């Protein structure tokens, strides 16, 4: 940091280019779930997390794990559920609760599948529903969602913002396309950036913005949004960059 104080932007760029030359990035790595070594790794990881005091463990993008040639390789059945059950047996040894993470449209009802098998699920619908309600002045969809969670006894972890941004894909089938587009236009107009579904153009996935920015940096709206989150069914997750 001290050195860069005396460097021009062009000089800094040359240093970065030099450091990055020839570097290759692996990205997210698939693990061979058929290997005993991988399951030994999973067991050790869960044991370590429990030793640090963890109670709930998020399984990031778990639905992509079981892959087979010729399959869609997203939520393959029964492979996905068999894998999840195998991980749960490991987690039970250490008194850990699993939180499977999955993004899919409301209409696909994957959240019901997860809940029906006895797992907690992320409420990725709530962030968009609150923005829709506050900006449109119509809270019916938010009310109906809260009612559904209670009536179907779905146990969730909810949030406003998160490191993935504000979910959009999840809202398909819950809000009309017009209302989703209005939400997108509102947040983008306040500095947000829409990320499309991987490999597809013009298929919205999420909008990147802090929740405070998405609400127009309005303190009253942010306070109300947080109150709604805290009193919704489910465990509230407070993200430090909301």
Where are these regions (language model features)?
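Active-site and adjacent substrate-binding regions of carbohydrate-active enzymes
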Residues: 1-242
């Amino acid at each position: 940091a001290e050195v860069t104080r005396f460097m021009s932007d062009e000089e800094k760029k040359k240093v970065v280019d030099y450091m990055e030359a020839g570097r290759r990035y692996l990205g997210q790595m698939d693990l061979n779930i058929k290997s005993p070594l991988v399951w030994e790794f999973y067991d050790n990881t869960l044991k370590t997390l429990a030793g640090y005091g963890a109670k709930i463990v998020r399984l990031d993008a778990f639905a992509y794990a079981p892959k087979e040639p010729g399959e869609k390789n997203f939520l393959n059945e029964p492979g996905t559920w068999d894998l999840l059950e195998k991980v749960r047996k490991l987690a039970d040894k250490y008194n850990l609760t699993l939180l499977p993470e999955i993004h899919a449209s409301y209409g696909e009802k994957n959240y019901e599948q997860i809940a029906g098998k006895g797992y907690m699920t992320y409420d990725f619908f709530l962030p968009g529903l609150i923005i829709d309600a506050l900006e449109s002045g119509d809270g019916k969809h938010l009310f109906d969602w809260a009612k559904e969670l209670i009536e179907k006894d779905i146990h969730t972890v909810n949030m406003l913002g998160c490191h993935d941004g504000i979910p959009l894909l999840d809202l398909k089938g819950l809000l009309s396309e017009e209302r989703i587009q209005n939400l997108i236009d509102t947040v983008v107009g306040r500095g947000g950036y829409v990320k499309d579904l991987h490999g597809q153009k013009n298929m919205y996935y999420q909008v990147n913005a802090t929740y405070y920015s998405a609400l127009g940096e309005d303190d009253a709206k942010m306070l109300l949004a947080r109150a709604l989150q805290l009193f919704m069914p489910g465990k509230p997750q407070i993200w430090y960059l909301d």
